[in-house]
């Protein structure tokens, strides 16, 4: 599952060769809902698609369960950050569909002759900043 506020997950999938990321999610409204709240989840999918050169198909729940409202707004975005389908409704079941040519994602990662989203990464510079080895787990 791709959590919309954890960009590392989309990047890891892209580095491992993903061309499309399917995100079955539970985007929930904030305790103090904002009028533009739905736009944030859509924007995150657009940005992550563009940054990683992947399609993202995010399917969210609708309605309310145990007093918790869900945002709905399922969306499909293209590898250059283009919205392809959606956003779907917040309170009605809908099916959204988009044609996803996976070769478009492969081309999108290669932005120019000298710029490649995946192979230009310099993990030798920032690996230690990721902190994976230094996480203290209390359990």
Regions found by a protein language model. Name each.
Residues 2-94:
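CN hydrolase (nitrilase-like) catalytic-core segments centered on the catalytic cysteine
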Residues 55-139:
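C-terminal beta-strand edge segments of enzyme domains
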